[in-house]
Amino acid sequence: MKFFFILFYPLSLLYQFLFWVSQFKIKPFVLPHVLVISVGNVTMGGTGKTPFVQYLVRYFKAKNKKYAITILSRGYKAKLSKVGAILRDGLSPHLYGDEPSEHKELFPDVQVIIGKNRKESFLKHNQIHSKFHIVILDDGFQHKQIHRDFDIVLLDANGPFGNGQTIPLGFLREPISHLRRAHTIVFTKLTDQNKDKSIRAINILKQKQIPVPSYTSHFLANLVQIDLNTLKSNPVQLPVDQIRQTKVLDEDANDGYFLFTGVGNPKHVLETAESIIGKKINQHRFFPDHYEFEESVLGSIIGEVKQGTVLLTTEKDWVKVRTKKGFLEELKKRNIQIFVIKIEVVVNEKESFESMLAGLVSTYEAKNDLVSMN
């Protein structure tokens, strides 16, 4: 262990220096007449940015109906990321990226724009010309090119800082001290088992004199049964208690469950699925984050599935998998049912957190002389 520390520590310092150089000369561009809220993290791997962005969209759609909403994303691994694009629908994840496609599918009336150069992509593709406009910058904490009015940083309660070291010695994308740039921190995936880790992380922030307010959140998980005959974008959803009563997920009525996923934190997906079903899932295949499922790979998954087994995957994976006609036809042919794990964020300190969000809107309106227009 000591050998690896000695080997990688200089590389970790070099990474920090190169990161500092890359950020030093950037002067953030102020997007005209919009309220910009960034959702980001400081670690590699999944912290729950996608469901948290969706939580914010739901909140603002419910509480600030006069506001138009834009989700601005890089579109990681998307074919059109380099040139930038605006999404018309969520049916082409290979062009626009899996998370942006998932956002557009879930919120058809929300403007979703992708681009490696997010500033230029927004200026080119934005079709909203109202001052009542909220832009949510997805994975934006390290993206200093765009000025943001508020920075929300997510920390996974299972391991907020990893080993406390930056890449490649650890999982941090930048040092813990950089959290001073954040306006608030939200610990995600909180459970009774990892609560102590979040408390220790808060103490570390206090020791480092980082006076950033923090909140906690957990996931509300559900399963959605896919109708393989229609493949509608809004499949029938069953509450957890109803799912447990169906023959489909009755352990006596099938030969088990097979989970496949390509996300940043597959272990947490597995634990979530097991908590919904109420039993252990022994069959699973994990793929790299943003994995593009080919028909051959999906065919090999079907080859491992016994008759009566229920397939499980995530919303992020389903956005891509549903376009594979050969796979879907084989599922129908073999009468294999597939369920999608649906995740929603619940902020534990809901009243305080939503009061903060309401304050952001009020401050923005006062700053831009919009109060009289309400």
Curated annotation (Swiss-Prot):
Stated EC number for the protein is 2.7.1.130
Q: Looking at the Swiss-Prot or TrEMBL record, what is one Pfam family this protein matches? A: LpxK
Catalytic reactions of this protein = a lipid A disaccharide + ATP = a lipid IVA + ADP + H(+)
Lineage: superkingdom: Bacteria
Task: Using the UniProt record, name the top-level EC class of this enzyme in a single word.
Answer: transferase
Which GO terms label this protein's molecular function in UniProt? ATP binding; tetraacyldisaccharide 4'-kinase activity
Q: In which pathway does it act?
A: Glycolipid biosynthesis; lipid IV(A) biosynthesis; lipid IV(A) from (3R)-3-hydroxytetradecanoyl-[acyl-carrier-protein] and UDP-N-acetyl-alpha-D-glucosamine: step 6/6
Q: Among the entry's GO cellular component annotations, what is one?
A: plasma membrane
Q: Where does ATP bind?
A: T43, M44, G45, G46, T47, G48, K49, T50
Keyword annotations of the record: ATP-binding, Kinase, Lipid A biosynthesis, Lipid biosynthesis, Lipid metabolism, Nucleotide-binding, Transferase
Q: Please give the InterPro entries that the UniProt record associates with this protein.
A: LpxK
Biological process according to GO = lipid A biosynthetic process; lipopolysaccharide core region biosynthetic process
Similarity annotation: Belongs to the LpxK family.
Q: What does this protein do?
A: Transfers the gamma-phosphate of ATP to the 4'-position of a tetraacyldisaccharide 1-phosphate intermediate (termed DS-1-P) to form tetraacyldisaccharide 1,4'-bis-phosphate (lipid IVA).
Q: What is this protein called?
A: Tetraacyldisaccharide 4'-kinase
The organism of origin for this protein: Leptospira biflexa serovar Patoc (strain Patoc 1 / ATCC 23582 / Paris)
Specify the taxonomic lineage.
Answer: Bacteria, Pseudomonadati, Spirochaetota, Spirochaetia, Leptospirales
